[in-house]
Amino acid sequence: IRNWGYYRVLHEDGTGAERKTKVKELTVDPGKSLSLQRHEYRSEYWVITQGVATVEIEGQPRELGIHENVEIPSGWWHKLSNETSSPVRIVEIQTGLKCEEEDIERAELK
């Protein structure tokens, strides 16, 4: 459990030097946000499966609703916020050399 909600890993593969893939389902509680962050070794692809999210990528905010998606290249700053009164659920597909929780740089900690 995180301060913004929770996630669960649905699928994970890739070993050694090959590209990795991880699929997660994230639930973001009403009024909560993921931190502004970027990843060195992985790209992410988000699909909204429930609710409406505000997604900021490289300083550009936009609203995404159910079945809408966005691709986030490695190294790009991004953030997801739930400004509604209902949970937001997304499927996150990670691909890259590392799909680990440690591959994260948070803007607030700089």
Residue ranges: model-predicted function:
Residues 1, 79-110:
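Double-stranded beta-helix
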Residues 1-24, 30-36, 104-110:
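A short, N-terminal "cap"/entry segment at the start of jelly-roll beta-barrel domains
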Residues 32, 41-42, 60, 76-77, ...:
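A generic "binding-loop/recognition-motif" signal
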Residues 35, 55-57, 92:
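Short hydrophobic/aromatic-rich beta-strand segments that constitute the beta-sheet cores
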Residues 41-59:
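Glycine- and acidic-residue-biased ligand/ion/polar-headgroup-sensing regions
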Residues 58-77:
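Short acidic-glycine-tyrosine-enriched beta hairpin
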Residues 26, 34-40, 47, 81-83:
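Short histidine-centered beta-strand/loop micro-motifs
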